[in-house]
Amino acid sequence: MRRVIILLAFGLLLRSPAAVAAQDPRLEARLDSATRARVEAALASARKEGLPTEPLVQKALEGASKGAPGPRIVDAVGTVLADLRRAREALGVAAAEDELVAAAAALRGGATPSMIGEMRRVTPHGAVAVPLAVFTDLVAGGMGTDAAWRSVAELARKGGDDEAFLRLRERLEPASPGSTPEAP
């Protein structure tokens, strides 16, 4: 018995730091082992590609909270990973984590990769996280994709800063649930 314990302890010491880092205790507590292994494989892929992992973890935890079956959780995590990859393609390898997350959400909200790239080109200093988040919020609030994009892109072309984008969102979001915002 003592020999088994020593071998197990030695095995733990030999595990790579990357393998240990890949394990998220939140996932261990909420997912079955098969689902967790597949989600952790997606996390490892994201890390290897320099993509943020927290959106993947959050999607897995969301699925677990809703009682989704393991394969559905894995599919949802894979979709988020694919969105982050598309965001990276649209923004380039130098994109910051917050920009990738915002771009992935904007893509899910109806933006195209070319729209994301355009935003990078026209936004002062190339910072796109806030403009893309505002676009996503407007679409989620009921504004049509085209109208929301025109509003955000126009402000970007005019050199709007983050505060201006947040004011745009406040101005264009519906005043009450169910009402539809209008484009300027």
Question: Could you tell me what each predicted segment is?
Answer:
Residues 21-184:
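General marker for long, soluble alpha-helical cores
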Residues 1-4:
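Positively charged n-region of N-terminal signal peptides that target proteins for export
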Residues 18:
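Glycine/proline-rich, flexible active-site/cofactor-binding loop segments
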Residues 7-15:
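Bacterial N-terminal signal peptides
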